[in-house]
Amino acid sequence: MKTNILKTMAVALVGLSLAACSDVDIQSTPYSEKVTDLAYTADGRDVTLTWQLPQAEGLSGVRIDKDGTLAAELDGAVTSWLAKHVAVNTDIYYTVKACYDNGLTSEGQTVKVRIDSDAKAKAGFLLPQADESTLDDDEKAALDWFRANYPDGVVLTPADMADVYPDEISEIWVQVDRVGMPQGWRNLPSELVADDVIAALANYVKNGGNLLLTKHATQLVAAIGRVSENRAPNLYSDGAGGEGTDIWTAQAIVGYDMTERYDHTSHAIYKGLVTVPESQTGFGGDTYALEGPGMREDHNCMWDCNNTSLEISNEPNVIKGFETATNSTVLATWAHVRDYCCAGIVDFNPDGDYLGRVLCIGLNAYEWNQNDRTNEYQSNIELLTKNCLDYLKQ
């Protein structure tokens, strides 16, 4: 009897179970259609991906992966995407997936992109403004020399900086030298210090690009954030200048009369430069001649390291304090300076987010066009510049 009751209960439970399953509406898994016809076209190093979207309901956008890592998420019925300045001589795999508003993502379609190139990085000259006819005579002389000596070099306008990359242009020279230009980087030519141009210059150095900043352009080292504003060049002049009979030279032994000297005469930027002996100048030792007698503008844009606004240590001296605070090397000062006063040529090393190097020449003697005659030491100006550009591209 007990056995029959148990059998009856079991049959009843099975019946209930079957009835419950038949009442459940099981949803089928949606089929996520994928994109088709994925292809690319290349314009130099810019690559445009194109594809066809599936004809499916609920499509919300696409996802693009580069070598398996998310590169972009695009909303809506998008059928193309631009990848700017892709790496050369390497295989890159782009995968495009369709995304749906139910949260599902389709399988991807993949295309291999390869741009072959044997081009080498070039030197660049950044104009302070696009209109060359408005350049100062010293800026024009520097530009003419650059064009003559770097036929493969690139002359850039400020507007070009948005599309400049260190692997194509590894170094950029900026020369600004003007009578009557007030101190402060915001007083540099307006095109040069536009917000987008300063941001592009900063990104250029952060990505490993190198800058040569000469005369009033040395102030850009603060504009791009490589040094703080209070450590911008603070020894400044912009007057018309005057006649002189002496020779203006650069002293590469910083602290010449001090207990601890910093001798940079073997540095690469001085290779081959003509020196003038102490017997002729009265300065400490042999110094590097940059400008001979005649009419000279006397424009400085450098650092007085004794100025307390720099907020640097004076231990063991202000030159070392400046170098430590800014991760730099002071390579030269005025030739007549025998102590630790001033920094006229400064090499700012790669530092933190700034992977590139910034080399500044702010000495008054670095004048590209002596107004009343040919500078008898013009060859030293030119060789110093060439050496600096060679040093920066290493």
Stretch-by-stretch model annotation:
Residues 252-357, 362:
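Catalytic beta-strand/loop cores that center a nucleophilic Ser/Cys/Thr
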Residues 54-69:
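Solvent-exposed loop/turn segments flanking beta-strands in beta-repeat/beta-sandwich domains
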Residues 22-58, 88, 101-118:
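Pro/Thr/Ser/Gly-rich low-complexity, intrinsically disordered linker/stalk tracts
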Residues 181-302:
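A glycine-rich, often tryptophan-bearing local segment used as a flexible ligand/cofactor-contacting loop or short
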Residues 122-231:
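Helical hinge/lid and interdomain linker segments adjacent to catalytic or ligand-binding clefts
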Residues 17-20:
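C-terminal motif of bacterial Sec signal peptides marking the signal peptidase cleavage site
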